Amino acid sequence: MKTVKYLLISIVLICSIQGCMDLNVPPVNVVTDDVVFGTEDGVKSFLARVYGAMPIEDFRYSQNNGINHFYALRSLSNLTGEALNRDVSSADHETHSYWSEAYMILRDLHYFIETLPSYQKKSGFSDAQVDQWTGECYFIRAMTYFAMVKRYGGVPLVTEVLEYNGDKLEDLDIPRASEEEVYNQIAADFDEAYRLLPEKTHASRANKYTAMGFKSRAMLYAGSIAKYNVANLVDPKTQKRLCGIPSDKAQNYFKLSYDAAKLLEGKGYELFTKAWSATDKEAQFKNFVDMFFDASSTENIFIRQYGYPTSVHGYDCYNVSRQYMTSNYSSYTNPTLSFVEMFDGFPRKANGEINVYDENGYYVLYDNPMDFFANAEPRLRATVIFPGDLFKGEALDAKRGIYKDPIGAGITRLLPEGSTERYNSAAATRDRITMSTNGNTQTVVTDSKGNRFNASGRSGPFNNDGVACLAGFGFRKLLNPNMSPDLVVENRSDHTWIELRYGEILLNRAEAAFELFLLDQGEQYRTDAYDCIKKLQERAGANITPAATNLTLDLVRKERRKELAFENKIWWDLRRWRIIELEQNNTTYRALMPFYILNEDKWFFDDRLDEDNRRYTFNTRWYYKNIPTARITESPSLVQNLGY
């Protein structure tokens, strides 16, 4: 066994990680090279470990705890306006550092790439096996550097094992590469993976087209930074631009993204339409729900598998609405009206907001709350649970309160537009509406016929209980509709995370193409962008954009935000477009509160600002994360990002 310890810059200073231990004494838990490289099983065990450590923002990711963490009560949707979370009351960013763990993965990948060839002959590995395994390492390296560059900008670029023999620690003090250099390395690694990998594998392992699919994502990010970023940080010693990419490079990166996405065309991937029908909204809804649970789906390009009891997550437990919970957790993801308003199928005000009023300014009354959503885009219905809609055979009971006054000619707006007052404390509403303080002790109301009603729904919202549908909607997307209620407990879910699907490839291709059209590269790019968007709109049951000439960049982005909602992608999109500070400038997101009218057996909806008055203001320094202070102390060549 080798006794020389190999390190990457992430592990400097040695004493801080190794406790100043003798580096020539092999740790007792280190596996020898013969065990790893001597058999196919050893290699597969290594690959399983690095695949598991690969940075993916999946079911076990949260912005405060990072990657591969069991306690994932927060998601990136809480930072984008997609959803409210009772534990998130203002704008924020990813507070967990992704630095040292990245370089530890990289060290292992480099060691594998450098060591495997020397074992090929004596272990009897074929050229095809060695190529595939090496290609997987290049793929994971590209993914790891992409996870870093989208957070920090330029980082120390290490592409081989660094040998440390105990003398010159300063040799491991590597300055940051430019952001452009890191993206170029990512592109090169994906290309090398494409060269080495086979055309077909199980979706949990990379193949040629997996590499190109992720290349399309990474290069789209790079192109956006080149075009939209304004931050500029230059290392005074190396003169490299650590944050930002020259704007004249945008076209090249968009073209790389477009070409990579187009390469997947005709390679066996397609939009999931197994239950879809062009004329049946119910089928379109069911198809979009089923898409995330069909193991044979040809839309899946790369997945992360889970399996009880060894590999689990708690997504269902944390995110089901209150009435469906069987543990101490629920309702951490609550879709906002601001999100819902992006979708088609609703009456609108002149300003584009959903309209809940008639021509006289009175609330429109409904026999059933689902009547309001009769024409809603099926993709939206598959993403959120509307009040009164079914989940696991049970209607979502979302009700803010019971309206008691006679309705006369009609009910006018309960509170002034823009109000964040609580209904139970506002003089205009506290005596007209009966509400429940919390979900444990419901207030009961009796109508003129002696019928008794809980004042608020079983899933809220309540006066003073955050375990509820905070914005009036339940959450559906990615929740297992077939999971038995008694199994909806912490760390019991084991359904698959789909990290890359063909729907995203079409979105990447459309956006890159439209950006190329805007850069005067030809009408054919706008036409291709339109064709991609139209396919997604048709599958979603959305309104179809009439023609390519009607397509805009905002429409392309909106389609992305609808299709990829709650898949932990939109936060990164808003970052690369550099628009979060425009959307979050003392912003309070909107809610849609359902009310039942006593003695009338009717419903109405009140559109309003979030009752808890959460306010979001994005700090533009968050477009680049701070490099951990300890790493800068250990490596003086590292330059901190702006604003920290």
Task: Label the predicted regions.
Residues 3, 16-41, 142, 186, ...:
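Bacterial Sec-dependent N-terminal signal peptides
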Residues 8-16:
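Bacterial N-terminal signal peptides
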Residues 20-65, 372, 384, 628-644:
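Membrane-proximal, proline-rich intrinsically disordered regions
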Residues 149-150, 156, 201, 218-230, ...:
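Short coil/turn linking the two alpha-helices of tandem helical-hairpin repeats
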Residues 38-60, 77-152, 169-208, 369, ...:
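Conserved, well-structured interaction surfaces
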Residues 61-77, 158-161, 198-213, 226-334, ...:
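Short, surface-exposed recognition loops and adjoining beta-strand edges that mediate ligand/DNA contacts
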Residues 20, 102-105, 185, 279-349, ...:
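Long, intrinsically disordered, low-complexity segments
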